[in-house]
Every structure is written in structure tokens, then in C-alpha cells.
């Protein structure tokens, strides 16, 4: 199901494929801090036109743990992009040197263009404001590892649900499971209508809320996203929203004992740092699971049948 496939959007993947990915990632956990030769001789090219810490490092670590090598760049500085080379030509060059390409770009559709140009499989490491499929896969994998299942859970998404690219992909991923999804944000920061229409058509159960306190007692998972300055064209709008939705120890007094708090990171002040040492904090575990999850993804795409 996975061999040779591009990973551009979550809409291309169903429940069966995700469950196969999760089982493979669980197997890969034992190799996440060692090195095996599953992909010896394979090369991954990374083309990160936007800043990244966790996504880039976890992809690079994953490939090296699998026995492969990594080439590429992080920012356009010092590359032919600075000289005016087109995205398509850059991808063609990387395609000639590698077996798989990971791209991050500020423009929506950049990963799709790369996939159309390249013969090698292309993985979207985040493009535009609406797609980050491997983060959504990681988010679901963390939930699956934490609870042993996804069906039947009440999952809250809180913060900037319009401009956070992780939210769009996560909603599309959740549409493969029987969950209740609580969208907690100001009305003007709800997910875009096109995404909501799609997940509703898939049967995802949604409710809208402006205050986390009114639903915190119902949630099994609370997924928090920061207000992203770089996604706002109007700095006044950013200042107005920043810090509006924050998780504190006081709020958690009403939460279920097993509530898992997730965050794609980096955080600013939307999660009180005093929560880091509570059983609710799963965001650092979530980040750590990025390596075995991406090991599994790369392995499934590149491995022989």
C-alpha cells in the first residue's frame, strides 16, 4: 500500500494504511536510538525552504537510523535558488541525486508540484498554511500509543485553528476514525470552510466552542497549537489573539485524570510550563515519537515488497 507513494495530503490515506504505519512505527521504536541497515545505500534529499527543528531533524535522524544517507539544504541561502532557479528545477536536481525527497515550503501546492516533477517519492514536510501530513500521522500515532486505540475518544483542538497547518491535516486524519472532535477557538480562527465541509462529509463529529473550560471535563485528548505570527498578515490581529487560549493548572482541575495534552511545538505561552511535570504532558513524548514514526514512513515507501 505504501511502496513508492508520495505523501502530499492526508486525504490520500485511509484507516488501513494509517494502522499499518502505526504498527510499523511501533516496531521501529526499538531502533530509534541505534542503527540498522534496512535502507543502506539509499539517499534522502531534504529541501527545507522554511525554518524547522523537529520535522527536519526527525526526518534526518530517521533516515540515518535506517542506514541511509541525507543530502540537501535548510534555507535557500547559498543555493541556486538565490540565483533565480525555479522550484521545479531544484527538485529535478535533487531527484537525480536521491531516492526520496522531503520538502517544506511556504507556498501551498509546492509539495504537489515537486511530486509531479520528481520520479522519486516526495514527502510533504509542510507547505502553505494547510498541509503537514506527517505531523498529523505523528499526532495520531501518539494518541494510539497512549490509549491503545483512537475510536471512541473525545479530542479537543484548541488555539489558532485557521492558520496552523497541523490542524488542517489532523482533522483530515481524524476523519478516518470514530471520534468526537471539539474545536475550541475564536469564531474567526475556526478551520477553513473547505476543510470542515470535507471532514463533515466523511462523518467526523464536530462541535464548536469558544472556551476550553466548558468542555475540558469531557476530553481525553487536548491538542494545543500556538498563535503563529508568521501566518498573520495583520500584526494587530496577531496581538489581539496571542495568549487568548492557554492551558493552566487551574483549568486541569476539571480534567479527566488520563487527559493527554499534545502540542506540535514550538510553544510560546499557550501551555503553562508548570504542566511539563504532570502526567497530562505528552508533547515531549510526541516529539520523540517523530523518529520511529518517520522511520516507518520512509521504510514503507522505500522498502522492497
Curated annotation (Swiss-Prot):
Binding-site positions, L-aspartate: 83, 165, 226
Which UniProt keywords are present, listed alphabetically?
Pyrimidine biosynthesis, Transferase
Name its GO BP terms in alphabetical order.
'de novo' pyrimidine nucleobase biosynthetic process; 'de novo' UMP biosynthetic process; amino acid metabolic process
Enzyme nomenclature, EC number: 2.1.3.2
Tell me which residues bind carbamoyl phosphate.
54-55, 104, 132, 135, 265-266
Which reaction is catalysed here?
Answer: carbamoyl phosphate + L-aspartate = N-carbamoyl-L-aspartate + phosphate + H(+)
Q: Out of the domains of life, which is the source?
A: Archaea
Q: Is Metal-binding tagged as a keyword?
A: no
Its pathway, per UniProt, is: Pyrimidine metabolism; UMP biosynthesis via de novo pathway; (S)-dihydroorotate from bicarbonate: step 2/3
Named from the GO MF annotations, one term is: amino acid binding
NCBIfam families documented for this protein: asp_carb_tr (TIGR00670), PRK00856.1 (NF002032)
Reported function = Catalyzes the condensation of carbamoyl phosphate and aspartate to form carbamoyl aspartate and inorganic phosphate, the committed step in the de novo pyrimidine nucleotide biosynthesis pathway.
**How does the record describe its quaternary structure?**
Heterooligomer of catalytic and regulatory chains.
Family of the protein in this entry: Belongs to the aspartate/ornithine carbamoyltransferase superfamily. ATCase family.
Protein name per the record? Aspartate carbamoyltransferase catalytic subunit
Amino acid at each position: 500500500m505504501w511502496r513508492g507513494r508520495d505523501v502530499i495530503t492526508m486525504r490520500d490515506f485511509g484507516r488501513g494504511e494509517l494502522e499499518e504505519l502505526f504498527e510499523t512505527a511501533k516496531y521501529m521504536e526499538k531502533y530509534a536510538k541505534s542503527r540498522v541497515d534496512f535502507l543502506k545505500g539509499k539517499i534522502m534529499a531534504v529541501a527545507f525552504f522554511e525554518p524547522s527543528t523537529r520535522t527536519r531533524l526527525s526526518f534526518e535522524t530517521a533516515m540515518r537510523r535506517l542506514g541511509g544517507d541525507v543530502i540537501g539544504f535548510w534555507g535557500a541561502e547559498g543555493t541556486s535558488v538565490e540565483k533565480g532557479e525555479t522550484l521545479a528545477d531544484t527538485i529535478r536536481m535533487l531527484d537525480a541525486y536521491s531516492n526520496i525527497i522531503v520538502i517544506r515550503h511556504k507556498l501551498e501546492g509546492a509539495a504537489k508540484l515537486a511530486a509531479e516533477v520528481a520520479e522519486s517519492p516526495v514527502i510533504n514536510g509542510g507547505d502553505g498554511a494547510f498541509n503537514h501530513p506527517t505531523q498529523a500521522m505523528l499526532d495520531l500515532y501518539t494518541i494510539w500509543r497512549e490509549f491503545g486505540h483512537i475510536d471512541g475518544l473525545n479530542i479537543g483542538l484548541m488555539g489558532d485553528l485557521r492558520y496552523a497547518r497541523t490542524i488542517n491535516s489532523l482533522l483530515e486524519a481524524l476523519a478516518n476514525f470514530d471520534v468526537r472532535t471539539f474545536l475550541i477557538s475564536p469564531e474567526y480562527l475556526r478551520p477553513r470552510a473547505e476543510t470542515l465541509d470535507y471532514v463533515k462529509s466523511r462523518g467526523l463529529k464536530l462541535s464548536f466552542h469558544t472556551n476550553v473550560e466548558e468542555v475540558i471535563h469531557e476530553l481525553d485528548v487536548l491538542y494545543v497549537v500556538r498563535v503563529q505570527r508568521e501566518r498573520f498578515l495583520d500584526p494587530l490581529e496577531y496581538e489581539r489573539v496571542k495568549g487568548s487560549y492557554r492551558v493552566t493548572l487551574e483549568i486541569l482541575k476539571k480534567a479527566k485524570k488520563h487527559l493527554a495534552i499534545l502540542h506540535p511545538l514550538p510553544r510560546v505561552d499557550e501551555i503553562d510550563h508548570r504542566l511539563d511535570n504532570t502526567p497530562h504532558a505528552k508533547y515531549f513524548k510526541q516529539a520523540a515519537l517523530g523518529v520511529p514514526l518517520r522511520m516507518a514512513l520512509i521504510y514503507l515507501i522505500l522498502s522492497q515488497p
